[in-house]
Design a protein with these regions (language model features):
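Conserved phosphoryl-transfer catalytic core
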Residues: 82-110
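Short, glycine-rich nucleotide/cofactor-binding loops
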Residues: 187
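Accessory N-terminal region flanking or inserted into the helicase ATPase core
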Residues: 1-16, 23, 39, 102-181, ...
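Walker B catalytic acidic pair
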Residues: 184
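Residue-level recognition of alpha-helix termini/interfacial anchor residues
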Residues: 77-81, 92, 166
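P-loop NTPase Walker
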Residues: 1-82
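Phosphate- and divalent-cation-binding pockets in alpha/beta enzyme and binding domains
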Residues: 52, 73, 172, 191, ...
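Catalytic micro-motifs at enzyme active sites that drive phosphoryl/nucleotidyl and oxygen chemistry
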Residues: 30-33, 144, 169, 196
Length: 196
């Protein structure tokens, strides 16, 4: 199913305010009327857009979500798995090492490092790795490297790499949904578009 979804794309290009969201909502209604058993995923960029798409669609087999919320829901059950933690280290080990060393002598990093030492006793790569037993999504503009809390942007990048490494996650999407709609495509990260 995932392969079929990947090869069955329609792209609607139009300027802001031209009715793309209305078009998608009408398509959703049509599918619900003609194929009431269909399972539909509709993801968008903002909560406002998600709320707009949900109007008059209650009770249908439709999941409407923001991109970040959906991606987090998809991968969060695996945040404590060894393979996921290993991928985190593969991606962030160098950044963590540089932050520990604080070669730029950044005052904020210095304070952050001191706080970590006060909380955990020592600040080494090994200590950080041992203290991160599970990742999380922080809904913040920056990733908290020492705690495994992924930022708004890094969540999408991390999910992309995780799904590429473990394509079964993509199959979960394809097996669960007959249709996938992405609203606000122009605002969507390339990492997400690459997934779908």
């Amino acid at each position: 199913m995932a392969g079929k979804i990947k090869n069955n794309k329609d792209l609607i290009k139009a300027p802001a305010g031209s009715g793309k969201t209305t078009y998608i909502r009408n398509e959703l209604k049509s599918i619900c009327l003609n194929n009431p058993e269909s399972r539909i995923l509709c993801i968008t960029y903002t909560n406002r857009a998600a709320d707009e798409l949900k109007k008059n669609l209650e009770g249908a087999n439709i999941t409407v979500s923001t991109i970040h919320s959906y991606i987090n829901d998809l991968i969060s059950p695996f945040y404590s798995h060894k393979e996921v933690l290993d991928l985190y280290w593969e991606i962030y080990a160098e950044k963590i090492k540089n932050r520990i060393k604080n070669v730029t002598n950044d005052e904020n990093i210095k304070k952050s490092n001191q706080y970590y030492i006060e909380k955990y006793g020592e600040l080494t790569e090994k200590a950080v790795q041992e203290n991160i037993s599970e990742l999380s999504y922080g809904e913040t503009p920056f990733t908290s490297l020492y705690t495994g809390k992924l930022s708004h942007d890094d969540l999408l990048m991390f999910a992309n790499k995780l799904i590429k490494r473990y394509p079964i996650l993509l199959r979960k999407i394809g097996d669960k949904y007959n249709y996938i709609f992405i609203d606000e495509y122009q605002d969507t990260s390339a990492y997400v578009l690459d997934i779908f």
